[in-house]
Design a protein with these regions (language model features):
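Sec-dependent N-terminal signal peptides of Gram-positive bacterial secreted proteins and lipoproteins
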Residues: 7-27
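Solvent-exposed, low-complexity, repeat-rich "mucin-like" stalks and linkers
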Residues: 397-424, 498-518
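Serine/threonine-rich, repeat-prone extracellular segments and beta-strand-based repeat modules
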Residues: 431-454
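Surface-exposed interfaces of beta-sheet-rich extracellular modules
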Residues: 449-476
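Collagenous Gly-X-Y triple-helix signature in extracellular proteins
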Residues: 37-332, 336-395
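Conserved "repeat-terminator" motif of extracellular CCP/Sushi domains
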Residues: 482-500
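Sec-dependent signal peptide cleavage junction
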Residues: 20-40
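N-terminal secretory signal peptides that target proteins for export/translocation
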Residues: 1-5
Length: 518
């Protein structure tokens, strides 16, 4: 136990020494006064998928998270509020609720007469239900639903690539004429609501069930916006009325022939999203430095998604953090983001080195970076379908030092814990596995036996092992094997001592076997 504690302590002390040596102004034991270092961007300006999934709209106090996705039909970018996660849909996802109307429509222009049922509406009723006609406030046949489906047919609202990121959602609604419920499966859909207190102060989006129509993800009255918009819910008392949102008041009813806004929801697939930034997608018109919350170019909690890139571009940060080597990224943009804002730099060759001092995060000379520490750095490009793909920069680990392994001693327990203080390695006290004859061994070491120590290491996020990474084990050159999750470092120790023969003139067969490891 004491030995293990000493190993951990030495590894921690060595790590601290290495970290402190990277700080400007630390020279020996005498610090010098320097300008304050920049810090990493706050989550309001840069977040991963888990951060996106943490937003909700069910409380007045909730901070609104927004995603820029698609257009509003007139060529302007459309913003969507993050309502939460749809537990009825597999995989990483969030429900998006339009932050402003996509258009307007009547719920149903033909409001006076019932409609004969048509299977082409693709409404699914409970088994055995016979439906011959429906009321004018039936969502499945409504002009409202037809208009929302129209938005998915051309590219005025969503590009073909954007449409592939949108999940279908199965939603239930009530059929008042037939005293039952039915479901439809669409991408864009109207929210559900109830005008009976206290349920009239929220609406719901996402997957629901036939026995809990208002059981989706809640959106509080304070998050509805300023427009009267249609819900998919029919009125309980009038077949020619359906429910709407009356901003700041409640859910209420309106005649189906009236024109109201369309504020739909949909489910966004996050499976290939890498991260999101408040920085807009870089372009010739969006480059250079952009400060947080300035000229609406970096708005807190309003994100542009960055999808995972499958390209061979790479940005490698030097171990001291002062430069980046960029390869295979001609015509892409290098993005550097910290707590001040973001800097977008166009790459104009396939092999380019960028110094930290080339990036100025503000108007003053002192805003030039000394290093890329505490920055989010990535390469990105945006295609004609408005899909931005990105690849995070990494710091390459070129050499590994593993220490504090005690060589095997015959008759004694193997040392199973090493120390590693190399920057970027995920653990400072890796486990040692001992190999003999191609098999792992435990317990005590044998006599006159050669053992190989094997240590598997993984890199921290933002680091990767170089293809030709070198390693030493207690100062001696070791072999390195790269694997899917990291590297395995191996070193073969000398044979353990032979077992002494107790009688110099007489030895049993067992004595000889122990002595020579037969």
């Amino acid at each position: 136990m004491k030995k293990k504690w000493l190993k951990k302590s030495s590894a921690i002390l060595l790590s601290l020494t290495m970290v402190l040596s990277l700080f400007p102004g630390m020279n020996g034991t005498i610090p010098t006064v320097q300008a304050a270092e920049k810090t990493s961007p706050e989550s309001a300006y840069w977040t991963d998928v888990s951060g996106l999934k943490s937003f909700s709209l069910d409380e007045t106090s909730d901070t609104e998270g927004r995603i820029i996705f698609g257009q509003n039909g007139s060529g302007a970018a459309q913003q969507w509020k993050i309502a939460g996660i749809d537990s009825g849909i597999n995989g990483d996802n969030i429900i998006l609720f339009a932050a402003s109307p996509l258009g307007s429509s009547a719920f149903q222009k033909e409001y006076n007469t019932n409609k004969p049922y048509d299977p082409n509406w693709n409404c699914t009723y409970p088994d055995g239900t016979i439906v011959s006609e429906v009321f004018p406030n039936h969502y499945g046949v409504s002009d409202l639903r037809a208009e929302l489906n129209t938005y998915m047919r051309d590219n005025s609202y969503f590009s073909e690539s954007e449409k592939t990121k949108m999940n279908q959602t199965t939603i239930y609604t009530d059929d008042k004429n037939n005293s039952t419920t039915y479901s439809v499966t669409d991408i864009l859909y109207a929210p559900y609501g109830d005008y009976y207190r206290p349920n009239d102060k929220y609406v719901t989006v996402g997957t629901n069930t036939s026995d809990k129509l208002n059981g989706g993800v809640m959106i509080n009255i304070s998050k509805w916006g300023n427009d009267i918009f249609w819900l998919r819910s029919p009125s309980d008392t009038f077949k020619s009325k359906a429910l709407v949102v009356c901003p700041g008041q409640s859910v209420c009813a309106d005649s189906v022939e009236d024109i109201n806004s369309l504020v739909p929801a949909f489910d966004l697939n996050l499976s290939d999203v890498s991260f999101a930034s408040a920085a807009e997608a870089a372009s010739s018109s969006y480059s250079g430095f952009k400060a947080n919350d300035t000229d609406n170019t970096m708005t807190a909690n309003t994100y542009t998604l960055r999808y995972k890139s499958s390209g061979n571009e790479e940005a490698v940060i030097s171990l001291n953090g002062t430069e980046i080597n960029v390869k295979n990224a001609n015509e892409k943009y290098l993005m550097v983001q910290n707590n001040n804002g973001v800097y977008a730099l166009k790459i104009d060759s396939d092999n380019q080195t960028i110094n930290a001092s080339d990036i100025q995060m503000g108007s003053a000379e002192s805003d030039k970076l000394a290093n890329f520490n505490n920055c989010k750095v990535w390469l990105e490009s945006t295609n004609a379908d408005r899909i931005t793909t990105a690849k995070m920069a990494v710091t390459t680990i070129n050499s590994i030092e593993i220490t504090d392994i005690t060589a095997p001693v015959a008759g004694s327990a193997f040392d199973t814990e090493a120390a590693c203080a190399t920057t970027g390695v995920s653990t400072t006290t890796p486990t040692v596995t001992w190999i003999h004859g191609g098999e792992s061994v435990t317990g005590n070491a044998g006599y006159n036996t050669k053992y190989t120590a094997s240590v598997t290491l993984t890199a921290k996020a933002g680091y990767e092992f170089a293809s030709n990474v070198k390693a030493t084990m207690d100062g001696k050159a070791a072999s390195v094997t790269k694997n899917q999750d990291g590297i395995t470092v191996s070193y073969s120790y000398k044979k353990t001592a032979p077992k002494a023969v107790s009688n110099a003139y007489f030895a049993t067969v067992d004595d000889l076997k122990d002595c020579y490891n037969i």
